[in-house]
Amino acid sequence: MTMTARTTVTATVNGIEVTVPAGGTILEACREMGTDLPTMCFGPTLTPANACRVCMVELEGSRVLVPSCSRVLEDGMVINTGTARAENSRKLVMELLGSASELDRASDDVSRWMESHRADPTRFGSPADAVARETPTPGHHKPPSLDEAATVAEPAKVEDDLYVRDYSRCILCYKCVDACGDQHQNTFAISVAGRGFDAHISTEFDVALPGSACVYCGNCIAVCPTGALEGKIAWDMKEAGTWDESKQEVTRTVCSYCGVGCNLDVHTQDGRIVDVTSPLDHEVTLGNLCIKGRFGWMYVYSGADAPSEAGGGLEGGRPPS
């Protein structure tokens, strides 16, 4: 007798039957039927890490809530997204993340999700003073007073002309680590250092980025959901209050640096290039680029308009050959 593999599975979500391709997740099923679940660590081109825990749902027969981004949908499952337990869990997690990290530069989706869940990070108290989070001595974290909220605040790291690492906005979603590691770039320039509340993203031995294994592909920037990792030009504009996506145009083109044929989305504002990304659904890039594709456009400016020659492998505004 020949066994035929199932190509679809059918489950019930919020009382409605939904059918999705076999191997799909609960999150995919929810989105298929238009249910808007919050996600912060999920990336469509990355293996789900279920690190942020903001996509939790109720699964009938399960003692605990399950992460919808990573739980594979099975035939006959009965899932509820709007139970009091599930909604309270998502609300609390978003409040904790928002009280510890600055989410002002996260996507508009995050603001919408927090509003729909009535999440109020300020209820934990005013932010505590910043503490040194990078030290060779473990266990340095001092809990704040009861009327203060512990934060991950620290000065932004501006070490070159390409990247800014502003870890006061980091929620430890691990997307940058996965993109730099075996899921995309295979460079392994960054990882998680420290334990507990002291955990943070770090280069090897906490060296400055230009002295690390980083190849400046910018793929970590592309997946960061909160603005903890950003291109220097975008970060400068946001600090100055001049970044305005409503005024930006996106032009699709093909990178000319080599013959691979990576698609580029060139973002312009007021007639100037401010960012370059790649579409997630492009079969070659999956949203990834190299230093030339992501940052090799700076040569179009010259003189006083050109970025400086500091760090990151740029020479006179051009990526190395």
Residue ranges, per PLM feature:
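Fe-S ferredoxin-like electron-transfer domains
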Residues: R53, S62-A213, A222, G227-V254, ...
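Short helix/loop capping segments that flank catalytic or ligand/cofactor-binding pockets
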Residues: N88-R90, D178-G181, V223-P225, K232-I233, ...
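Catalytic and ligand-binding motifs that coordinate phosphates/metal ions
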Residues: K247, T251-L280
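N-terminal cofactor/phosphate-binding cores enriched in small/glycine residues
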Residues: I16-D75, S89
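Eukaryote-biased recognition of intrinsically disordered, low-complexity regulatory segments
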Residues: T4-I16
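Cofactor-/ligand-binding subdomain signature composed of acidic, glycine-rich
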Residues: Q269-S321
